Amino acid sequence: DMKIGVSMSQFDDTHLTYLQQSMDEKAKSYPDGVVLL
């Protein structure tokens, strides 16, 4: 598994929430598995 650290200052912004969801979906699409921390 590959682990990638991600830091965002806030999640009360709709754009950042969509960004986080998209990153999670993309991470799950990799065959070896990527975990966003």
UniProtKB/Swiss-Prot annotation:
Entry keyword set: Periplasm, Transport
Keyword Transport: yes
Keyword Transport: yes
Superkingdom of this protein's organism: Bacteria
Main location: periplasm
GO cellular component: periplasmic space
Subcellular location: Periplasm
Family named by the database record: Belongs to the bacterial solute-binding protein 2 family.
Note: The molecular weight of the complete protein is approximately 30 kDa, there is a single affinity site for myo-inositol.
Name this protein carries in UniProt: Myo-inositol-binding protein
